[in-house]
């Protein structure tokens, strides 16, 4: 233990003073003051939304040097769970709040932040990619139910007269972890196939009757790439990244449409136009909307917020959401990550009302992207 100097002691030598100054500087560096510490925000959940969230986080941090945002892809199920438990600032989900989800995670607020889709990917060696595989919802459901087992099944041949499909067993690939991507697919299948609806239904983690499972969006595209004669599903970004072909799905008006930023955007606009007074921007209003170039398995991507966060954390969340629904909707951020914007002109009043409720009555202004 150091002793105090008495009044008669000699003054410290220059070398001692330098040592003390060095230790003081080091302690300031190692143990920063509160003013030096960064605000930390955490986002976890949807692996589909992860690439866009990462871009948003880095862009937001540049504009707000005192903020650090950690983003992780744990699956939509974990996004809901950790937001509900208050373990993260924001949960991310491809799945809207069904009655079951609301019962399991009460009081959560879903805010649409972007649009994406779920595409059907496949690996058919030696088959030309110039013409995409065509599938209607019922045929696709029968494949995932194991009731269509070979690529040259008469129902597949009837939908694809321009493709020479071989007599090869179909290898089904699906998600292992609770997934919003799976929720979107099973919701689509439930709306297009009575058999799927009655036997499996809509779920983040259904009881798959057949197939091989993989974790995460990257796991699905990786599995399909590695397994010949396989079929699976993934989001637009991951499909483009994998280089795999995606099928054209039959939409409400009978057109076979592939997933693209245009067809996703058209689905959102058509949905809002068809149901302008809807109080829930969920996928039920995006499926089966009319239009020619409208992709039928488009979906809103959500941030899930716990309204019981402490006031300081909620203020940080408010600022981030304000930015995401404003400058964050800029095409330079969205399109590079494979996403389309929320149709803001139509949904602005509804989103503003949601955020007023979420932010304890504070007013909220959705700014113009730029």
Language-model segment annotations:
Residues 1-15:
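N-terminal secretory signal peptides that target proteins for export/translocation
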